């Protein structure tokens, strides 16, 4: 189910439903706040297995069945893809550093499931396909165990006093408050902080 559905689920009294036939709970499409994971597990006993993919990539990162998910992590790269996190200069990021999720392409051939370009739009295709990589436009960090943690879209980062702030990170902290059901963070220009 998409993350929006899980946010609706946790607002319901799930104890009045027979969920015994559900063996797995998966999600992708947008980041899911850890608080939603925790509330859903508390209500159902199920751990949501998060993943990441795009229309252009299919599922490229996931908490696959048989793996031990880390709550809030998208999981690990699919064996189909050589996923790396790159800094703005095209260098691989160190563990814990934020960078763009990219897929390395060998010999100029896209792996199975990865698109090869936008229909009749070479300019847009060239924006995402360059230097031997497909650039997703999404940012993440990779931890010491190889799990990826979603930060946000590159074009959705808020800059304040020279700091880069991911709205999802702030939303996740706010969602932990017991009296908050939903929240959204957006940037607003400030004359002093930018």
Name what the model sees in each region.
Residues 80-81, 131, 136-137, 181:
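Short loop/turn microsegments at loop-to-beta-strand junctions
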Residues 77-80, 91-127, 165:
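Conserved ATP/PPi-binding loop(s) of AMP-dependent carboxylate-activating enzymes
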Residues 1, 10-70, 82:
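Gly/Ser/Thr-rich phosphate-binding loop
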Residues 2, 103, 111, 124, ...:
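AMP-binding/adenylate-forming catalytic core of the ANL superfamily
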Residues 87-89, 98, 144-145, 179:
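Residue-level recognition of short loop/turn positions
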Residues 61-65, 86-87, 103-104:
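Short beta-strand-to-turn element immediately C-terminal to the catalytic PLP-Schiff-base lysine
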Residues 29, 53, 75, 138, ...:
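Active-site glycine-centered loops adjacent to acidic/histidine catalytic or metal-binding residues
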Residues 86-87, 95, 136, 142:
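Hydrophobic alpha-helical segments, especially N-terminal targeting/anchoring helices
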């Amino acid at each position: 189910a998409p993350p929006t559905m899980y946010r609706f689920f946790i607002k319901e009294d799930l104890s009045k439903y027979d969920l015994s036939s559900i063996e797995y709970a998966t999600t992708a499409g947008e980041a899911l706040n850890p608080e939603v994971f925790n509330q859903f597990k508390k209500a159902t006993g199920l751990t949501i297995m998060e993943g990441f993919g795009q229309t252009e990539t299919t599922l490229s990162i996931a908490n696959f069945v048989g793996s031990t998910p880390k709550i809030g992590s998208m999981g690990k790269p699919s064996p189909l893809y050589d996923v790396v996190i790159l800094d703005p200069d095209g260098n691989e990021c160190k563990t814990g550093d934020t960078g763009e999720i990219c897929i390395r392409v060998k010999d100029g051939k896209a792996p199975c499931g990865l698109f090869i370009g936008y229909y009749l739009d070479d300019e847009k295709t060239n924006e995402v396909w360059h230097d031997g990589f497909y650039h997703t436009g999404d940012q993440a960090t990779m931890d010491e165990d190889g799990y990826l943690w979603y930060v946000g879209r590159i074009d959705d980062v808020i800059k304040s006093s020279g700091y880069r702030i991911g709205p999802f990170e702030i939303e996740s902290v706010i969602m932990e408050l017991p009296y908050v059901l939903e929240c959204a963070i957006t940037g607003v220009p400030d004359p002093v902080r930018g």
